[in-house]
Amino acid sequence: MKKSIIITGGAGFIGSHVVRLFVNKYPDYRIINVDKLTYAGNLANLKDIEDQPNYRFVKADICDFDTIYALMQEEKVTGIIHLAAESHVDRSIKDPFTFARTNVMGTLSMLQAAKLYWESLPEKYEGKRFYHISTDEVYGALEMNHPEGIEPPFTTKASSHEHHLAYGDDFFYETTKYNPHSPYSASKA
């Protein structure tokens, strides 16, 4: 079976590197980049791969369950790498509702779409994977310096992290979480 992978947040800083890596390293995979193109998304990051035959960009909101579910059916998705998130600290203070909507409800939308679609297949979850890329902030601050725990901007990421763990335990054979710490590159300098 040919692999077909949705990468959410694929026009963002980390996501664009992941999309490029998969498009170039796995020419037999179908890579579907789903991004809402908010302040953090920039398709110019992917100009060099936009015409690759195994690449597709879909402008969509991960909170739009119907669109995500239909896309999974259309593309026969076998895996998800979920990077889409609100992460800008100043924005989280000004507009916590947007953070909660994207980070919690968007993650739930992705998890539920994957669950329902993969359950509908004869092979169910076999060979399917859901990777959730979060943040090291879900662990909170080290107690010796900051006993107050997780700072408000990161509570939504902690919630999405917990939803992923719960779905992984109850529904999926293969789930992986990754919580990077201070990603950096020359383009971010």
What do the predicted segments below correspond to?
Residues M1-A189:
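N-terminal Rossmann-like NAD(P)+-binding domain of SDR-like oxidoreductases, especially those catalyzing
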